[in-house]
Amino acid sequence: MNLREKIDNSPMGFYQWAIVLMAAVMNFLDGFDVLAIAFTATNISKDFGLSKTEFGMLVSAGLIGMVVGSMVLAPLADKFGRRPILLLSVAFSAVGLAVSGFSTTSEILAFSRILTGLGVGGILVGTNVITSEYSSKKWRSFAISVYAAGFGIGAMIGGMMAKSLQAAYSWHAVYFAGAAMTAVVFVVLFIWLPESIDYLNAKQPQNAKARLNKIAHKLGFAGEWELTEKRAEKAVKLPITALFSQKYLRSTLLLWLSFFAIMFCFYFISSWTPALLKEAGMTVEESINVGMMISLGGAAGSLVYGLIASRWSARSVLMLFTVASSIAIVVFILSSANLAIAMVLGVVVGALINGCISGLYTINPATYDADIRNTGVGWAIGAGRAGSVLAPTVAGMLLDSGWDKQTLYIAVAGVMLIATVALAFKKSHIEIKRA
């Protein structure tokens, strides 16, 4: 039995759960960042005189950075290792948030959002993969859901901090706080985050065996562990091209479509709900509270998905969540005139959509072999970020052109069902391995 098989089939120990927690904290930073921009929207737009379309483009600037980060940094992680690229990504994010705090023009803020997004994109890929690789088969879905729950918790705290810091200081303080938290996380990761076991086995860099055994002892697995037999390098110049081989083509394209649709819906809900509810008659505080309820539901929904998917097929549970999310989005917007109902339904919408994201993060790494896993995961997340880039901008343009919020939310619910269809036709990981 090699170390990979030992991890797959053994109970998860303290260090493995610590790795999952570190990944969750990194995802927490993504959640903080997304809700920080959503909840500072009113003051930023007022300071810089931005229209809805212009603010949507500002939000999209950060998301463009995420697309580039997930697609460009992911292949580098397959080549140089998950750990160094994760550390680089966290550093980018910290610097970007600090520059956001110092921004005096919308152009500087847009640049800082791209830089932050670049880091977040790299973080998302690395954390998803490393969580999957250090989890046992039994607890993998739940571990990924714990990691995914970090986003909802970060979003909720981001909303709370945005609310209090803007009241006491200004919107700039929100980004300074984010930069400080990210810098602390960088130090923690530098000390405790290990390299990927699968990377060490697949690429076998210098001192790979010694590093493998050092990690094994931290995991509580005594003895001398050998590297697995190194597979012959495939005649592929770029791991990206392998995603379109006969083995992976269908699953790659359907995964991309699923990510695009679900992330489009998620970022529309996250970015626009507080502002639209305020325009509909809620106070700023009430609209932010509903936004935080969506985030609170998100944290719970990720965990609920993980528990259910530990018992049944991860893909089937994900399809069920997409259908339920579509229905919940429509019911939410039709009931938004009542604050109490809106807050309750906000929790439900947040839970279901974040459960969908947990599902994507669960089935995505299992689709690809270790030598191209980071690339496969990164490009799928990048496709999702393309949806998230379009969501705020398209929504802003449609609102400026006269669409009402009910029509817009119903259209978004329809986009969610596209993911349901794509997932229905995607090959299972067992079918892919047999190919």
Residues of each region from the PLM?
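Conserved MFS/SLC helix-loop-helix module at the cytosolic interface between two early adjacent transmembrane helices
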Residues: V68-S106
